[in-house]
């Protein structure tokens, strides 16, 4: 069983309850007027429950789980990983939003850095939860600041939200950009350098 985690200090949640999720999906199918016992839907509740277990796996991880490996290389210039794929779920409508994240930091004066893949894994920890893009962006930045203790952090997330594309206002292709900037990267010149690297194609 996965240990419970605490989200934003608002209490803990336990391990994923696959049977309960399966029963809930079955009830949802009935609620929308479908027959969950017909051939095409008979296995759907189980499939959806297993999919949700994967999609929301970040609920049962902490950033410390992925930022475990650090190196003291004496590198004191910016480290930036661009175009990290983001797949997340809007907590308001439980439909996907997807796009890319750009994550950069200026290492501490000790030169402590983490593996590049760890930055992508950190994005996944927070993306694989019911989310809003603004909080996702902030959580990534705050985790890097608290765990790596760098001199500065910048996180830019650019996503298309299916809740805007397939329902409501129905504007497919519209993208939302959010950013979180901490420490020395708030200096206008340093921030401009980071943004020029992020926006370069």
Curated annotation (Swiss-Prot):
Binding annotation for Zn(2+): 90, 93, 163
GO biological process, one term: tetrahydrobiopterin biosynthetic process
Single GO MF annotation: GTP cyclohydrolase I activity
Lineage: Bacteria, Bacillati, Actinomycetota, Actinomycetes, Kitasatosporales
Pfam families xref list: GTP_cyclohydroI
Superkingdom as given in the UniProt entry: Bacteria
UniProt-recorded name of the protein: GTP cyclohydrolase 1
Catalytic reaction list: GTP + H2O = 7,8-dihydroneopterin 3'-triphosphate + formate + H(+)
Assembly and oligomerization: Homomer.
Family per record: Belongs to the GTP cyclohydrolase I family.
Organism of derivation: Streptomyces griseus subsp. griseus (strain JCM 4626 / CBS 651.72 / NBRC 13350 / KCC S-0626 / ISP 5235)
EC number assigned by the record: 3.5.4.16
InterPro entries linked: GTP-CH-I_C/QueF, GTP-CH-I_N, GTP_CycHdrlase_I, GTP_CycHdrlase_I_CS, GTP_CycHdrlase_I_dom
Pathway: Cofactor biosynthesis; 7,8-dihydroneopterin triphosphate biosynthesis; 7,8-dihydroneopterin triphosphate from GTP: step 1/1
GO cellular component, one term: cytoplasm
Keywords: GTP-binding, Hydrolase, Metal-binding, Nucleotide-binding, One-carbon metabolism, Zinc
């Amino acid at each position: 069983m996965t240990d419970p985690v605490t989200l934003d200090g608002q209490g803990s949640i336990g391990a994923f309850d696959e049977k309960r999720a399966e029963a809930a999906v079955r009830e949802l199918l009935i609620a929308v007027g479908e027959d969950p016992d017909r051939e095409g839907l008979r296995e759907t509740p189980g499939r959806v429950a297993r999919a949700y277990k994967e999609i929301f796996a970040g609920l049962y991880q902490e950033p410390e789980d992925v930022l475990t490996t650090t190196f003291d290389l004496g590198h004191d210039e910016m480290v930036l990983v661009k175009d990290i794929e983001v797949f997340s779920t809007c907590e308001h409508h439980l439909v996907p939003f997807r796009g890319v994240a750009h994550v950069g930091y200026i290492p501490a004066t000790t030169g402590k850095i983490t593996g590049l893949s760890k930055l992508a894994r950190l994005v996944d920890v927070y993306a694989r939860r019911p989310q809003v893009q603004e909080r996702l962006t902030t959580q990534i930045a705050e985790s890097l600041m608290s765990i790596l203790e760098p001199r500065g952090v910048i996180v830019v997330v650019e996503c298309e939200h299916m809740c805007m594309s397939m329902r409501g206002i129905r504007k497919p292709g519209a993208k939302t950009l959010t950013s979180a900037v901490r420490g020395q990267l708030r200096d206008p010149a340093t921030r401009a350098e980071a943004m020029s690297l992020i926006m370069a194609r």
